[in-house]
A protein has these predicted regions:
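C-terminal reverse transcriptase regions that engage the nucleic-acid substrate
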Residues: 1-62
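Flexible loop/turn segments at secondary-structure boundaries
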Residues: 5, 13, 78-80, 89-90, ...
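Mobile genetic element proteins and their domesticated derivatives, centered on retroelements
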Residues: 19, 72-74, 82-83, 109-113, ...
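Eukaryotic intrinsically disordered and solvent-exposed regulatory patches
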Residues: 54-59, 68, 113-115
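Two-metal-ion RNase H-like nuclease active-site motif
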Residues: 64-77
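Short coil/turn segments at beta-strand junctions that form active-site/ligand-binding loops
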Residues: 67, 122-125
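A short, polar/acidic, helix/strand-boundary loop motif
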Residues: 85-108, 116, 132-151
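Helix C-cap/alpha-to-beta connector motif
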Residues: 117-121
C-alpha cells in the first residue's frame, strides 16, 4: 500500500527502502511464503512512524516544471567528471573508491557534481544527464531496494 501512494506523496520512495529490504529478506528466508511473520528493523520502524505521523499532510505536485539548468555527469573506475553551463570539473577516485561497483561510482559522481556547483545551483531545478541507465532509474525512483550503500550516499 505504501508504494501505491507514491504518486501522491512527494519523496515517499525515500522512506520505505528499509521496510522493503526487510520484506525481501524475510521472503527469501521463508522461501516466498507471505503468511510467515517477519522481523522489522529499527530503521523500518522509523520509516513506518514517519508515514503514520505525516499521512494527513502529505502531498505531491503533478510537475516540477522545466529545469533551470542541465548538468552532465560521468564516472569510470578511474574518476568522475561533470559539466554545467560550459564549466567542467572532476577528479580521480581514491583507492578505496575506485574498487566500488560502477553503480556506486556513478551515483557518487552525481553527488560530487552537485556539491561542486553548489553556488551555481542553489534553489534551482537541475536536470542531471547520466549515461548509466541503472543510476538514472535509481535517482528517478529516489533510491533502490537492492543497495543500502547507494541509498546512504
Amino acid at each position: 500500500m505504501l508504494t501505491a501512494s507514491f504518486p501522491g506523496v512527494m519523496f515517499g520512495p525515500l522512506h520505505y527502502r528499509n521496510l522493503d529490504m526487510d520484506k525481501t529478506a524475510a521472503l527469501k528466508f521463508s522461501r516466498g511464503n507471505y503468511n510467515k511473520t517477519m522481523a522489522i528493523s529499527d530503521e523500518a520502524k522509523h520509516e513506518l512512524r514517519r508515514w503514520m505521523s505525516s499521512v494527513e499532510t502529505t502531498f505531491s505536485v503533478v510537475s516540477h516544471g522545466q529545469a533551470d539548468m542541465t548538468m552532465t555527469t560521468d564516472a569510470s573506475k578511474t574518476g568522475w567528471e561533470c559539466s554545467l553551463g560550459g564549466i567542467s570539473t572532476g577528479s580521480s577516485w581514491d583507492l578505496g573508491e575506485s574498487e566500488k561497483h560502477i553503480n556506486w561510482l556513478e551515483v557518487k559522481a552525481i553527488l560530487f557534481s552537485l556539491k561542486s556547483f553548489t553556488d551555481h545551483i542553489s534553489k534551482k531545478h537541475i536536470k542531471i544527464l547520466s549515461d548509466h541507465t541503472t543510476v538514472v532509474c535509481c535517482i528517478n525512483h529516489m533510491g533502490t531496494s537492492h543497495s543500502q550503500e547507494i541509498n546512504f550516499l
